Regions:
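Active-site loop-to-helix "anion-binding N-cap" substructures in soluble metabolic enzymes
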Residues: 1-162
Length: 162
């Protein structure tokens, strides 16, 4: 397995990190345990210091529909920023897949949180084309979501192969 510390980041501009932000929340959408965020912070900080654009990819809960507001990261973004101690650019998956990278200022590294990956049918179906539509926009994919790695889902299975 390759280590991030051994990579040459000179030609790496866009990095996707599969994180596990499936955090427990209370009835008021307050995060009750930040352990999963804390575990990802070191890797995110390391790549952030390499001046790359970072795209955080995660699931949250088990939504039964394509979009369910109660499983949207939009309700948690402020808490994520407080815990992780950096600003996040929240973008929906539709925007990312269509033009997300084109809309970002690549001269100024950005950390973006993509909407809940489980809103998209291709995730659960482990769809290769869905995976490629994301990884084709990336120079590097990092799986930091070891707790989700047993899933046969696109973001932990197919993306690692692309």
């Amino acid at each position: 397995m390759k280590s991030l510390k051994n990579l040459n980041f000179e030609k790496i501009q866009n990095v996707g990190i599969r994180v596990d932000f499936n955090v427990p929340i209370d009835k008021n959408f307050r995060i009750t345990d930040k352990t999963r965020l804390d575990r990802s912070k070191e890797t995110i900080d390391f790549i952030k210091n390499k001046q790359c654009n970072i795209f955080l990819i995660s699931h949250f809960g088990r939504p039964k529909e394509n979009f369910d507001e109660k499983y949207s990261f939009s309700k948690l973004i402020d808490q994520f920023e407080n815990i992780l101690e950096f600003k996040l650019n929240f973008i929906s998956y539709d925007i990312f897949l269509n033009s997300g990278l084109n809309e970002l200022d690549v001269n100024k590294p950005t950390i973006s949180l993509l909407e809940n990956i489980r809103f998209f049918e291709g995730e659960i179906k482990n769809d290769l084309n869905f995976s490629k539509s994301i990884t084709d926009k990336l120079d590097l994919y990092v799986n930091e979501a070891f707790s989700a790695s047993h899933r046969f889902h696109s973001s932990v299975n197919q993306m690692a192969k692309n």
